[in-house]
Amino acid sequence: VRDGYIMIKDTNCKFSCNIFKKWEYCSPLCQSKGAETGYCYNFGCWCLDLPDDVPVYGDRGVICRTR
């Protein structure tokens, strides 16, 4: 398992979030990816205890591509 920023599948960009709602959005989103929990950190959803097969922002070769 590992921690990291989960990404939007089509763009490889981080899921953005509201830091004033630290857990409300990110925790359920991270849990849907198999993480224990998650929270908003530096305006992105940071997930704790993700399965190793879930790609995270910063993995080798991962580039955020906006349209």
From Swiss-Prot:
A Pfam family hit: Toxin_3
One CC-aspect GO term: extracellular region
GO biological process: defense response
GO MF entry, a single one: sodium channel inhibitor activity
Chain segments annotated as transmembrane: none
Broad class of the protein's primary localization: secreted
Function: Alpha toxins bind voltage-independently at site-3 of sodium channels (Nav) and inhibit the inactivation of the activated channels, thereby blocking neuronal transmission.
Name of the featured protein: Putative sodium channel alpha-toxin Acra5
Taxonomic classification: Eukaryota, Metazoa, Ecdysozoa, Arthropoda, Chelicerata
